[in-house]
């Protein structure tokens, strides 16, 4: 299926690896030119070069912490009229409520609520004026199915979902959609970090913790980041203009539900 995206322009955050990189790859495969962001310059520049070479698109790297207003301004300067925004950020470190410091809360909210909110504020008006816009927020399944050591992530990301719910109706009539993807367990560095923390608590090795979790999953495997990438690309497509305000769980059936 041609997604009708060739020649469009996208900003993709946290794009040097993992789910962000997968979203960038999937969009580039559809002919979308990219402006990519991540904290560390070298891997980001390498990702941009590899994506551009593989797909024949323009891919520009803007390194820095998306929580920094100057970095957000640089992203918009590099892509002043984006058609697509993929908000994505590394999640906060796992822990228990009593262990969270004021700095922990600030970092969690800056990266997973304030920064994506600021990016939304920067792009939505222009998208609406041009008559096309697609925003995809990569959040987490913990918004719907909390994990006891993911309190910071659940709190910050749930806040973003709440904000999105107030914006959808205002913009969908001008062909601007905003959706959330809620990944479950995917084979990323983030997964390994989380299970290393849990393994330490349980007195087992990270490998044992990962194997036990995989055995519990209905799919008997962790998700591949490309599966999130392809879902993201479809939500950004010309065919998805009637899908907005949705929070789509992609977790291999790990969390049973009726609605």
Regions found by a protein language model. Name each.
Residues 14-17:
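Conserved glycine-rich cofactor-binding loop
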Residues 32-46:
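Conserved glycine-rich Rossmann-like NAD(P)H-binding loop of the short-chain dehydrogenase/reductase
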Residues 96-97, 104-109, 213:
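Substrate-binding pocket helix/loop in short-chain dehydrogenase/reductase
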Residues 125, 169-170, 241:
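Alpha-helical segment proximal to the catalytic Tyr-Lys
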Residues 136-159, 164-173, 185-186:
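Catalytic loop of short-chain dehydrogenase/reductase
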Residues 145, 233, 244-259:
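Short C-terminal tail/terminal secondary-structure segment
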Residues 172, 177, 243-245:
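Short, small/polar-rich loop/turn modules that mediate ligand/substrate recognition or access, typified
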């Amino acid at each position: 299926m041609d997604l009708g995206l060739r020649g469009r322009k996208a900003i993709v955050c946290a794009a040097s690896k993992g789910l962000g990189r997968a979203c960038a790859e999937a969009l580039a495969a559809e002919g979308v030119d990219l402006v990519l962001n991540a904290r560390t310059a070298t891997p980001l520049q390498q990702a941009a070069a590899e994506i551009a070479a593989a797909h024949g698109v323009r891919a520009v790297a803007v390194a820095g912490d998306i929580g920094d207003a100057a970095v957000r301004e640089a992203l918009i300067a590099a892509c002043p009229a984006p058609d697509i925004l993929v908000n994505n950020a590394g999640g906060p470190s796992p822990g228990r409520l009593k262990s969270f410091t004021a700095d922990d809360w600030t970092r969690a909210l800056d990266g997973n609520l304030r920064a994506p909110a600021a990016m939304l504020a920067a792009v939505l008006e222009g998208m609406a004026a041009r008559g096309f816009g697609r925003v995809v927020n990569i959040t987490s399944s913990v918004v719907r199915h909390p994990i006891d050591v993911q309190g910071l992530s659940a709190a910050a990301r749930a806040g973003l979902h709440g904000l999105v719910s107030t914006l959808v109706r205002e913009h969908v009539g001008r062909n601007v959609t905003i959706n959330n993807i809620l990944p479950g367990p995917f084979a990323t560095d983030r997964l390994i970090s989380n299970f290393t923390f849990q393994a330490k608590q349980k007195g087992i090795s990270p490998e044992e913790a990962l194997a036990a979790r995989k055995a519990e999953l209905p799919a008997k495997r962790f998700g591949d980041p490309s599966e999130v990438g392809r879902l993201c690309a479809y939500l950004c497509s010309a065919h998805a203009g009637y899908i907005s305000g949705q929070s789509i769980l992609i977790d291999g059936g790990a969390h049973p539900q009726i609605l």
